[in-house]
Amino acid sequence: MALKKRTVVSPAAGAVSLPSLMADLPGTRRLEEVPLDKLSPAPADWNFYAPLPDDKLLELIESIRANDLLHPIVVWKQPDGALVILSGHNRVRAYTALLEKTGEDKYRRIPATVLTDITADEAHEIVVDSNYVQRVLTPSEKARSISQKYALAGRKKRSRNGVRKSKYEQIGEEYNLSARQIARYVRLGSLDGS
């Protein structure tokens, strides 16, 4: 599968924003409010990232209470109607905590970009890319992210000028890293068992 060309840069490297990443989402999408109790997390092997520490989660809760949710979560609607969280696990945790603490009905549903007509590989890529954009990753998380991105990437493809690019070069352009750095992260990620 050939991945869609986009630039994805981590916060440590001067991030592309989450909204700009979300503007390039594949598939059919619509914005709606979805019930918290209908959401399920992405598979653990896709979403291996540590949850926010308690102090950062409290900051998120207070921000949502004061300003509402600034960025909708992203969910993948399965053919059976199940909703899998692709981006926003911590926002769902914050909404759940607010519902438990306040009992207010407005926290029973959360704004979401609902995606349909996407593949499992595209869904997996959204989990990896959104976490890469939003967080300062540990070295092992970064290696595992890049290793998974590499596994999802297609074979060599031609660039606009007709030159073939390796998967390392393709991902390096997206993540603002050299092909050599990508190769190193892929090797490190494979040591981690991803």
Q: How would you name each of these model-derived features?
A:
Residues 1-2, 162:
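Short, low-complexity interaction segments enriched in Ser/Thr/Pro/Gly
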Residues 2-113, 124-136:
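Short, charged/polar connector segments at secondary-structure boundaries
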Residues 133-194:
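Alpha-helical interaction elements
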Residues 118-122:
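A short acidic, often aromatic-flanked loop/helix-cap motif at beta-alpha or helix-coil junctions
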Residues 68, 116, 186:
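Short, small-residue-rich loop/turn micro-motifs
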